[in-house]
Amino acid sequence: MAGVGLAAVPAWVPCRRWGLAAVTFGFHHGLSTLLARKTERAPQWLRACRHKTSISFLSRPDLPNLAYKRLKGKSPGIIFIPGYISNMNGTKALAIEEFCKSLGHAYIRFDYSGVGNSDGNLEECTVGKWRKDVLSIIDDLAEGPQILVGSSLGGWLMFHAAIARPQKVVALVGVATAVDGLVTQFNQLPIETKKEIEMKGVWPMPSKYSEEGVYRIQYSVIKEAEHHCLLHSPIPVKCPVRLLHGMKDDIVPWHTSVQVADRVVSTDVDVILRKNSDHRMKEKADIQLLVYTIDDLIDKLSTIVH
């Protein structure tokens, strides 16, 4: 995989803005040691994620209104794209907001159609419709160059956004990136099970993150998702890409991020693995790694611009 860096243990350099350490990538010192910083030195965004920004709504003709929260600030802006049926108030979304506040960077987080405070019927939502949601946020709300941070399904959608808006999307950060995830999981089912789902029209997909223990996904949603698969050919994204993944992820195997890295055309791609992290990657060390990765990209982009 020429140009692809696989780093289970990032190295560190002093950060110019708030005195801790920012991530660089390569096989160097142990990550657990490097992340074991004293809490008293941690920036405010790591100590507490305060939910202060007011909710706004993006009105769209013939499409559901989208709930969002926005911080005005400098470029590049950051947009957080949540996971499947996740809203904009998750741990990662709030931590990134506090990080952006501390540096004065623009930031947007939002709810998909049919999720959270946004309008729309979840049962009618598809990968294609959520892709349109992301593009609406980029086109109608974001100003200037943007770093997209996608979690799980959001990681799949961020690649579609980068392909559709290459002039505006300048870097990608994926967390447990689930490119083609819905289709891949369905295709791994036994033939008899797939036939039964097709006949009934609903897939009760098991999930420990659902209160019912399953997500009820329409068969039509799975078939529609097939039109948005990316792993069957080179992914035409040329910007810097960072893919963070937990090796204990039992929803989207970490090998998926390696496969994505291999498919991406960009030569500036790093896969960063956390040995003991799960799919959600929401522990303190995971969040530190995420924001340090974003900070490193901001540094990199500033160097390129200037």
Curated annotation (Swiss-Prot):
One of its GO terms (cellular component) is mitochondrion. Residues 1-52 form a transit peptide. The keyword Chloroplast does not apply. It catalyses: S-hexadecanoyl-L-cysteinyl-[protein] + H2O = L-cysteinyl-[protein] + hexadecanoate + H(+); mycophenolic acid O-acyl-beta-D-glucuronide + H2O = mycophenolate + D-glucuronate + H(+). Keywords: Hydrolase, Mitochondrion, Transit peptide. Residues 78-177 form the AB hydrolase-1 domain. GO terms for biological process: protein depalmitoylation. The active site is at S152 (charge relay system), D249 (charge relay system), H279 (charge relay system). One of its GO terms (molecular function) is hydrolase activity, hydrolyzing O-glycosyl compounds. It is found in: Mitochondrion. It comes from the Eukaryota. Inhibited by palmostatin-B. Belongs to the AB hydrolase superfamily. Acts as an acyl-protein thioesterase that hydrolyzes fatty acids from acylated residues in proteins. Regulates the mitochondrial S-depalmitoylation of the nucleophilic active site residue of peroxiredoxin-5/PRDX5, a key antioxidant protein, therefore modulating mitochondrial antioxidant ability. Also catalyzes the deglucuronidation of mycophenolic acid acyl-glucuronide, an active metabolite of the immunosuppressant drug mycophenolate. This is Palmitoyl-protein thioesterase ABHD10, mitochondrial.
